[in-house]
A protein has these predicted regions:
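Helix-breaking motifs and short loop linkers at transmembrane-helix boundaries and internal kinks
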Residues: 132, 164, 185-190, 387-388
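C-terminal transmembrane helical hairpin of 12-TM major facilitator-type secondary transporters
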Residues: 368-408
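Juxtamembrane intracellular "pre-TM" segments in multi-pass secondary transporters
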Residues: 89-96, 276-307
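Cytoplasmic helix-loop-helix junction between adjacent transmembrane helices
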Residues: 197-231
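Intracellular juxtamembrane helix-capping segments at the cytosolic ends
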Residues: 205-217, 407-420
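Conserved MFS/SLC helix-loop-helix module at the cytosolic interface between two early adjacent transmembrane helices
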Residues: 151-187
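Helix-to-loop junctions at the C-terminal end of transmembrane segments
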Residues: 153-164, 353-365, 450
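Helix-loop-helix hairpin linking two adjacent transmembrane segments in secondary transporters
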Residues: 228-272
Length: 485
């Protein structure tokens, strides 16, 4: 019987009928929109409840007929319910599935935020000429940024297991806006160093996103979803070099950092509107949280191996990128920053490899992917050294080193989350801190070798680091993991 044909004896019966009908409409729209359970403690539910109570009182004191009031309540309640359900943020459940709109938001924001680490690479030569400093001092900008990133990974990312991740992310976006503006307005190299350190520390946001993709994806989709987020991250790295090279040539290197600050504001708004609150998984104090990192390192040898061999390979990767601007600025290229940035497009092959590696890492095996990755990086360095005075040799080297690096990074990073799923942020902290410490070491060694031996020295240190990563893989056998207490 529809409500227009129904008769009520008192207001209490009307109120009961309203609540039953309202819950039914909620359930219908939940089923249609695939939205999680309606939370009765939600403020909007309470608002609806007060609305019903108001109309109940309205009827009881005789100010209106039950039938007309009932029609009004249905109209208002339906509008309220639909408005709420369409705007409600999805509640995430572990292994319950990650909605596509959240997954792609994570991937896009990861790419835009990680780009802050790499804007400087095509601009180093331009910055050096404007500030009148040495190549070594200029190269320290890239190294300090990577060190800052490692610090952020070590001390901030673990907080995702202790506090709500959304608050951590928004705080870091706020600090990023100020640090990027400081770099753009810096009068000397020393302020750039300090602001670059803060930029590096706060740019660890993507490494909070990666555990989210792993933790809340269905088991069969974990590798694919982690690969999508990392693909977004890699695309951001590649695009950062292209964009900064172009902007540096057309507008100037300072303007690039002002634009980046504006992009961080947009990312903060996106996270605020789309990402749901995620409850922490660790109970205790920050000191206990940090101590648990050492327990994880001690108890899981595979975690140490995965992290170290990937970090050493990343050092080889960044050795190339940190000195490429200096190489391309000399004979026979004499290239400007926009040309150096365009070379970043060659790494699109590496970004496209990420989701593929994530999908097949279980079938092919971590060990095999590491052999493939190291082999490709060694071929890259051969091309960069023996054919380094031709665009063909440089492009081939960039392609090979990007694809090889993704084979190593993604196979190892995807596998670490299987070691201890309940400590996903801390496991990722250990991996990525080691990873970027290796990157910082490679950047520093490459800068020193460039000063002494030029491009041959850079190729030499890159090859040595790759061989060391390969040796670790050869000597290590994959192990099964016991659960972390």
């Amino acid at each position: 019987m529809c409500f227009s044909q129904r008769r009520f004896s008192n207001g209490s019966e009307i109120q009961s009928y309203l609540f039953a009908e309202f819950k039914q409409r909620i359930a219908t729209m939940q089923l249609f929109l695939k939205i999680p359970d309606f939370n009765k403690r939600n403020k909007k539910f309470q608002l609806a409840k007060h609305l019903f109570s108001f109309h109940y009182l309205y009827i009881k004191i005789g100010c209106g007929s039950a039938q007309s009031s009932l029609k009004t309540v249905f109209s208002l309640a339906s509008t309220l319910a639909f408005h709420y359900l369409c705007r409600m943020k999805t509640e995430l459940k572990e292994n319950g599935g990650l909605p596509a709109h959240i997954l792609w938001t994570l991937a896009i924001v990861a790419g835009v935020s990680v780009a802050n680490l790499y804007y400087n690479q095509p601009l180093l030569n331009v910055i050096r000429h404007e500030l009148g400093v040495s190549e070594f001092k200029t190269n320290l900008i890239a190294m300090i940024t990577q060190v800052g990133y490692a610090i952020g990974l070590l001390f901030i990312v673990p907080l995702g297991d202790l506090y709500q991740r959304k608050k951590i992310i928004l705080t870091n976006f706020t600090l990023l806006i100020f640090s990027l503006i400081a770099i753009g307005a810096a009068p000397d190299i020393y302020i750039i160093w300090g602001a670059s350190l803060i930029t590096g520390i706060c740019s660890m946001i993507p490494q909070i996103f990666v555990p989210i993709a792993s933790q809340f994806s269905r088991p069969e989709n974990k590798g694919r979803n982690v690969g999508i987020v990392i693909s977004g991250l890699l695309t951001g790295i590649l695009a950062s070099r292209v964009v900064s090279g172009f902007v540096g040539e057309v507008l100037g290197w300072r303007e690039m950092y002002f634009i980046a600050a504006g992009m961080m504001l947009l990312c903060a708004i996106a996270v605020l509107k789309i990402l749901p609150d995620i409850q922490p998984t660790f109970r205790g104090k920050y000191g206990d949280l940090m101590k648990s990192l050492f327990s994880l390192i001690k108890d899981y040898p595979s975690l140490r191996i995965y992290s170290i061999r990937a970090g050493i390979a990343f050092g080889s990767f960044l050795a190339m990128w940190s000195c490429l601007a200096f190489k391309m600025g000399q004979a026979p290229f004499y290239a400007d920053s926009d040309v150096i940035g365009i070379l970043g497009l060659c790494g699109i092959a590496g970004a496209s490899t990420a989701s593929l590696v994530g999908k097949y890492v279980k079938k092919v095996g971590i060990r095999n992917f590491n052999f493939i990755g190291c082999g490709l990086i060694l071929l890259a360095w051969a091309s960069l050294y023996f054919c380094g005075n031709t665009y063909a040799g440089i492009i081939a080297g960039v392609l090979l080193i990007d694809i090889g690096m993704q084979c190593i990074q993604l196979s190892n990073q995807t596998s670490i989350f299987d070691i201890c799923p309940s400590a996903s942020n801390r496991v990722n902290t250990i991996f990525m801190t080691t990873y970027f410490t290796g990157g910082s070491l490679g950047t520093f060694l490459a800068g020193s070798c460039w000063q002494t031996w030029g491009w041959a020295g850079v190729a030499g240190i890159g090859t040595v680091l790759t061989l060391l990563s390969l040796l670790i893989t050869i000597c290590h056998k994959e192990q099964q993991h016991a659960p972390f207490p």
